[in-house]
């Protein structure tokens, strides 16, 4: 497998300063986990926060552990969701510095911005419901009349609070008059942040718990809860694959983003947008932020993006065998444990040349 941590040159990192400043907070995973977040001085000293976010940090110290958790989840979820793609989000580990794949207004940066925005609001909403934050609690009881056989109760995710605090944090750099970066890039990033939050809102669903004799479920207590991050990330992956390339154009009295190929219509609020086309990520090219796919695992029988033909860009692949140990022949013993044997199995793996 290609490593997920890479050395990058200072020149490449400098190009990020204004454009991807709004996702530098993903770098809080490096040292933010070791901070107690009980002193406002921490907000200024740690890498990853631009000035406007530092001010929000000082006013909302109790939220910062959730921000750190969201940064971890964004990195993990991004890499898991795109593990079958040539661009597999490995460069996000360089945060708070980034290579051009995340600093040039690309399709990939659109996905990461949207995912980070959704993840932060999701994390805060869940933290409210679990009692981790002193400034919020369960979500409000739904206004809609409950259906037959259930009643509103439990503790729903506080989506309203999560959206308010999350958007204030991730949008702050683009809304600041002092921030660097082009106006087109700021509009793009704000748009993609909003798309991420909309997918999060669309994931809100009714969840229920049964009550009754012997699990008869004669009565159900229900609440509104968010779906898990993998579901939200997969929705955003679909939008990533169908993202629209845009240009910054004068329309009427103001400039706005319009589709490059279909500039007769405005950008839809539901679609991810990008300004700069990406390379194919087949070969290593640090100047483009491409790590290449050499030594990446591929699937010989797949016809999707993880197939050896697509992943290896026609270069071919090498095969090797690997022995794995797994649990097998498991038996349940009364009461109350399961005993399993350990079995060895030989599997064939394929890596790109």
UniProtKB/Swiss-Prot annotation:
A Pfam entry, by short name: wnt
Function as written in the Swiss-Prot or TrEMBL entry: Ligand for the frizzled7 transmembrane receptor. Primarily acts via non-canonical Wnt pathways mediated by either Ca(2+) and PKC, or by JNK and dvl2/dsh. Depending on the cellular context, can also signal via the canonical Wnt pathway mediated by beta-catenin and dvl2/dsh. May also inhibit canonical Wnt signaling. Maternally initiates dorsal/ventral axis formation by a canonical route, which signals via lrp6. In a complex with wnt5a, activates the canonical and non-canonical processes involved in axis formation.
Entry comment on modification after translation: Glycosylation is required for protein secretion.
Family, as annotated: Belongs to the Wnt family.
A GO molecular function held by the record: protein homodimerization activity
Any GO BP: endocytosis
Protein species of origin: Xenopus laevis
InterPro entries xrefs: Wnt, Wnt_C, Wnt_CS
Residues with lipid group (O-palmitoleoyl serine): 214
Endpoints of the signal sequence: 1-22
Self-association state and partner proteins as the record states: Homodimer. Secreted homodimers form a complex with wnt5a homodimers; tyrosine sulfation of both wnt11 and wnt5a by tpst1 is required for this interaction. Interacts with the transmembrane receptor fzd7/fz7. Interacts with lrp6 and ryk. Interacts with tdgf1/frl1. Interacts weakly with frzb1 and strongly with frzb2/crescent. Interaction with frzb2/crescent antagonizes wnt11 function in the neuroectoderm, but enhances it in mesodermal tissue.
Induction of expression: By t/xbra. By gata4 and gata6. Repressed by zbtb33/kaiso.
Residue pairs linked by disulfide bridges in the UniProt entry: 78-89, 128-136, 138-155, 208-222, 210-217, 282-313, 298-308, 312-352, 328-343, 330-340, 335-336
Tissue: Transcripts are expressed ubiquitously in early oocytes but become vegetally localized during mid-oogenesis then enriched on the dorsal side by the 8 to 16 cell stage. The protein becomes asymmetrically concentrated on the dorsal side by the 64-cell stage. During gastrulation, expressed in the lateral and ventral marginal zone, and during tadpole stages in the somites and first branchial arch. Weakly expressed in the pronephros from at least stage 12.5, with kidney expression increasing until stage 35.
Note: Xenopus and other lower vertebrates contain duplicated wnt11 genes resulting from an ancient gene duplication event, but the second copy has since been lost in mammals. This gene was originally called wnt-11 but was renamed to wnt11b after the discovery of wnt11r (now called wnt11).
Cell compartments where the protein resides: Secreted, Extracellular space, Extracellular matrix
PTM annotation (Sulfotyrosine): residues: 274, 281
The protein's name: Protein Wnt-11b
């Amino acid at each position: 497998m290609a490593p997920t941590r890479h050395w990058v040159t200072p020149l490449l990192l400098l190009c990020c300063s204004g454009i991807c400043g709004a996702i530098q907070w993903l770098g809080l995973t490096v040292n933010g986990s070791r901070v107690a977040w009980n002193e406002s001085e921490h907000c200024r000293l740690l890498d990853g926060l631009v000035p406007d976010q530092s001010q929000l940090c000082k006013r909302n110290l109790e939220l910062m552990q959730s921000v750190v958790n969201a940064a971890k989840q964004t990195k993990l979820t991004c890499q898991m969701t795109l593990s079958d793609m040539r661009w597999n989000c490995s460069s996000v580990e360089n945060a708070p510095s980034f290579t051009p794949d995340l600093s040039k207004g690309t399709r990939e940066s659109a996905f990461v911005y949207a995912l980070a925005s959704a993840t932060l609001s999701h994390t805060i909403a869940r933290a409210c419901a679990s009692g981790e934050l002193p400034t919020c609690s369960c979500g409000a009881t739904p206004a809609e009349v409950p259906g037959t056989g259930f009643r509103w109760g439990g503790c729903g995710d506080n989506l309203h609070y999560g959206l308010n605090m999350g958007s204030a944090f991730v949008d702050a750099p683009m809304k600041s008059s002092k921030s660097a970066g082009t106006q087109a890039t700021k509009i793009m990033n704000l748009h993609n942040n909003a798309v991420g939050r909309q997918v999060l809102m669309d994931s809100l669903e009714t969840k229920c718990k049964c009550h009754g004799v012997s699990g008869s479920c004669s009565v159900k207590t229900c609440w509104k809860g968010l779906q898990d991050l993998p579901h939200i990330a997969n929705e955003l992956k679909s939008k990533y694959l169908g993202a629209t390339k845009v240009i910054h154009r004068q329309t009427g009295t103001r400039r706005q983003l319009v589709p490059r190929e279909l500039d007769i219509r405005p950008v839809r609020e539901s679609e991810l947008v990008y300004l700069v086309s990406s390379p194919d990520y087949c070969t290593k090219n640090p100047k483009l932020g491409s790590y290449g796919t050499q030594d990446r695992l591929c699937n010989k029988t797949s016809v999707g993006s993880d197939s050896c033909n697509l992943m290896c860009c026609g270069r071919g692949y090498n095969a090797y065998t690997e022995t794995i140990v797994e649990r097998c022949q498991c038996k349940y013993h009364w009461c109350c444990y399961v005993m399993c044997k350990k079995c060895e199995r030989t599997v064939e793996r394929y890596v790109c040349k």
